[in-house]
């Protein structure tokens, strides 16, 4: 009985470790097998090269640069045959290199999307099958938060709100959204409209929900916490 009771916290602790580190375990576990399968599938089944707007723009800029060099050399006519042949070979090599580079980008995108999908499926299955463990973990967290003093709670709320919706938060959201972009293998630039919209609106939405929660829930549950929070903000 004692051994059984001692194994329960270890089981729940292992559940926490499993949930926290799963996003890193999945890419490491499927790195070689899944990446080789995606590479083989892409190389054998794709007859055309698909490019997004950013990739297409980069390739066009490179080709325009090479074409300008080609035309300039043709106009100068200095060592024409030899120079033109070198430029033709260089243009061909550059074309092959660009195609390989963008094929690797597409493989990278598919691989990351696949690993994230697998991670989501595993977490969904875990939340359904291990509902009891998650319920107990949730009760532990609630008990821990309940035992904290009102001052520590107010300080924690102030710290989290300043971090997420404070004056310097847009830069943090920009880095976080950029990380999500890279994690899914998506290309983005500094002028990305979606990134700008999310960075400008998401902190405002969070701030609105937080203020509503603060005055509707905390005012009813712990008025002293609200008083301490307002005193610290002032």
UniProtKB/Swiss-Prot annotation:
Indicate the segments annotated as coiled coil, or none if absent.
Answer: none
**Pfam families annotated for this entry?**
CemA
Q: Where in the cell is it found?
A: Plastid, Chloroplast inner membrane
Q: Its function?
A: Contributes to K(+)/H(+) antiport activity by supporting proton efflux to control proton extrusion and homeostasis in chloroplasts in a light-dependent manner to modulate photosynthesis. Prevents excessive induction of non-photochemical quenching (NPQ) under continuous-light conditions. Indirectly promotes efficient inorganic carbon uptake into chloroplasts.
This entry carries the following GO cellular component terms, namely: chloroplast inner membrane
The species is: Citrus sinensis (Sweet orange)
The protein's name in its UniProt record: Potassium/proton antiporter CemA
Family, as annotated: Belongs to the CemA family.
Q: Which molecular function GO terms apply here?
A: antiporter activity; proton transmembrane transporter activity
Indicate the transmembrane segments per the record: 8-28, 117-137, 157-177, 193-213
Its placement in the membrane is given as:
Multi-pass membrane protein
Its organism's taxonomic lineage begins at: Eukaryota, Viridiplantae, Streptophyta, Embryophyta, Tracheophyta
An example of a Gene Ontology BP annotation on this entry? potassium ion transport
PANTHER family cross-referenced by the UniProt entry: CHLOROPLAST ENVELOPE MEMBRANE PROTEIN (PTHR33650:SF2), CHLOROPLAST ENVELOPE MEMBRANE PROTEIN-RELATED (PTHR33650)
UniProt cross-references to InterPro entries, sorted A to Z: CemA
Keyword field:
Antiport, Chloroplast, Hydrogen ion transport, Ion transport, Membrane, Plastid, Plastid inner membrane, Potassium, Potassium transport, Transmembrane, Transmembrane helix, Transport
The catalysed reaction is: K(+)(in) + H(+)(out) = K(+)(out) + H(+)(in)
């Amino acid at each position: 009985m004692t051994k059984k009771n001692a194994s329960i916290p270890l089981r729940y602790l292992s559940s926490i470790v499993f949930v926290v580190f799963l996003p890193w375990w999945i890419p490491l576990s499927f790195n070689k097998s899944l990446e080789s399968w995606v590479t083989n599938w892409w190389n054998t089944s794709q007859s055309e090269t698909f490019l997004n707007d950013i990739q297409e723009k980069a390739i066009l800029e490179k080709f325009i640069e090479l074409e300008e060099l080609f035309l300039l050399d043709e106009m100068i006519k200095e060592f024409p045959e030899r120079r033109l042949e070198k430029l033709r070979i260089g243009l061909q090599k550059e074309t092959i290199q660009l195609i390989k580079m963008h094929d690797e980008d597409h493989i990278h995108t598919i691989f990351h999307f696949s690993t994230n999908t697998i991670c989501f499926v595993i977490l969904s299955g875990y939340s359904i099958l291990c509902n009891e463990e998650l319920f107990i973990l949730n009760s532990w967290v609630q008990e821990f938060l309940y035992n904290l003093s009102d001052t520590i709670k107010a300080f924690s709320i102030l710290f989290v709100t300043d971090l997420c919706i404070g004056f310097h938060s847009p830069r943090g959201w920009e880095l976080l959204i950029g990380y999500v972009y890279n994690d899914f293998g998506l290309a983005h630039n500094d002028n990305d409209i979606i990134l700008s919209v999310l960075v400008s609106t998401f902190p405002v939405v969070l701030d609105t929900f937080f203020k509503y929660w603060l005055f509707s829930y905390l005012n009813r549950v712990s008025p002293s916490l609200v008083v301490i929070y307002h005193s610290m903000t002032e």
